Amino acid sequence: MKIRRIMFMMLAAFSLASCSSDNEQEKPYTTDPVENAVFTESDIEWFNPTTREVKFYAQEESLSQRLRKTDGELQFRLGNDVVLKVSQFVGDWDSRTFKDLVLHYDVISNSEQGHFYLQDCYPLQFMNDEQVQTNIKKNAEQWNAFIKYLEKIGKIKK
């Protein structure tokens, strides 16, 4: 009986001694810090204003992997100015709805190689939505500046 009591007290003492006595909050695990992606004219190989496809010098798959880590706005800096602001990077895997300008990575139409498109909303079935139409008008000036700049430096594909 005495041995059981001693064993119980040792077990209780060991359990209590191994508990942490500080109240510090556990820090969340994160990988790399999330940054907004910025593209410059040196990143863009060409842009097709008809289809709105943008071809980057970087490999599509590695660029797609990097962009998946971003959260929020993407910027196209041409010269010293931010010419075009994109609300989000989306892919064919995305089930969310966006009613503002997005950079869409399309892998369904060509499974061997994905393509990037600048679209006014995602998915495109919401193109006639009132909020999308308002944002199209709001972004018209950005689009004009973006296309004029790319024309000036010879990066428009027709």
Can you describe what each PLM-predicted range is?
Residues 1-5:
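Positively charged n-region of N-terminal signal peptides that target proteins for export
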Residues 6-14:
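Sec-dependent N-terminal signal peptides
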Residues 16-18:
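C-terminal motif of bacterial Sec signal peptides marking the signal peptidase cleavage site
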Residues 22-158:
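A structural signal for conserved, well-ordered secondary-structure elements
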